[in-house]
Amino acid sequence: MDLEWKIEKRERHYQRFVTSDHPDTRPGRGLGVHGLTAAFYASGDDWIPAFSVARNPDVLGRPQADRRFTFEHAPYSAVWRDAVMFWAEEHAIEDADRERLLTRTPEPALFSALRRRMNEEGNDIPTEALSSVYREQRDALAATRAPAQVLEAALMDDLNDWQRRHKKHRDSAA
């Protein structure tokens, strides 16, 4: 019976780990699981947005610094994937829970809200700090606009050709 109780306790602990924020997670930073949060880190005069993964102690039991996944060199969705994969590996997360989290990419607006909250807490994070967070969205928007601009130019060429032909036809009929 004691073994059964320990197994049930371990399962409850695991379910809480993969379905709720850690109780010590500060407001606006939680992503719905223990050990994975949204953050801004000060680096000199800059504020760097990142997903942060809590790490297990090293082999000697010493705490390790969180691993930060920033948006400087990769798009938002890829950074989320990398952070979730590392979190799952670091904390021995089951495949189904890892996959569930991979499909729930938080909106970049999370970082806008976090920036506001942290500024209310006394920080001074400029809006420019969000630039790398929204880069993927800006690139996608630019990609959808480019074909529309090409189509618009082609339609204008067709319209101009039609107007020239129509004017020529009118002039010759007169």
Describe each PLM feature range.
Residues R10, H73-P75, V79, W87-E90:
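Long, charged/polar, surface-exposed segments that mediate recognition or autoinhibition
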Residues W47-Q64:
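Short, well-structured beta-strand
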Residues R98:
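Nucleic-acid-interacting cores, centered on viral/eukaryotic replication and modification enzymes
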